[in-house]
Curated annotation (Swiss-Prot):
<comment type="function">
    <text>Enhances the tyrosine carboxypeptidase activity of vash1 and vash2, thereby promoting the removal of the C-terminal tyrosine residue of alpha-tubulin. Also required to enhance the solubility and secretion of vash1 and vash2. May play a role in axon and excitatory synapse formation.</text>
</comment>
<feature type="region of interest" description="Disordered">
    <location>
        <begin position="1"/>
        <end position="30"/>
    </location>
</feature>
<dbReference type="GO" id="GO:0005856">
    <property type="term" value="C:cytoskeleton"/>
</dbReference>
<keyword id="KW-0964">Secreted</keyword>
<dbReference type="GO" id="GO:1905048">
    <property type="term" value="P:regulation of metallopeptidase activity"/>
</dbReference>
<dbReference type="GO" id="GO:0006508">
    <property type="term" value="P:proteolysis"/>
</dbReference>
<dbReference type="Pfam" id="PF15674">
    <property type="entry name" value="CCDC23"/>
</dbReference>
<feature type="coiled-coil region">
    <location>
        <begin position="31"/>
        <end position="51"/>
    </location>
</feature>
<dbReference type="GO" id="GO:0008017">
    <property type="term" value="F:microtubule binding"/>
</dbReference>
<dbReference type="GO" id="GO:0045177">
    <property type="term" value="C:apical part of cell"/>
</dbReference>
<dbReference type="GO" id="GO:0005576">
    <property type="term" value="C:extracellular region"/>
</dbReference>
<comment type="similarity">
    <text>Belongs to the SVBP family.</text>
</comment>
<keyword id="KW-0963">Cytoplasm</keyword>
<dbReference type="InterPro" id="IPR031378">
    <property type="entry name" value="SVBP"/>
</dbReference>
<feature type="compositionally biased region" description="Basic and acidic residues">
    <location>
        <begin position="1"/>
        <end position="22"/>
    </location>
</feature>
<keyword id="KW-0175">Coiled coil</keyword>
<protein>
    <recommendedName>
        <fullName>Small vasohibin-binding protein</fullName>
    </recommendedName>
</protein>
Length: 65
């Protein structure tokens, strides 16, 4: 009976083709979502940096006058 148990365990550990495809698709979707989040964060940070730079320039300009 032990060899049958071993076969069952091997079957459970080895994902089927459909499972692998689902896993790969899920990983690709996760990667795309993370990439979109990174781009969105980068955009926000760039805008903030630009605002801070403009404020700094105004401050420097008012000090020199």
């Amino acid at each position: 009976m032990e060899p049958a148990c071993r076969k069952d365990k091997q079957k459970q550990q080895t994902p089927t083709r459909g499972d692998r495809t689902k896993q790969k698709t899920a990983q690709q979707e996760l990667k795309q979502r993370q990439r979109a989040e990174i781009y969105a964060l980068n955009k926000v940070m760039t805008e903030l940096e630009q605002q801070q730079f403009e404020a700094f320039c105004k401050q420097m300009q008012s000090q020199s006058e």
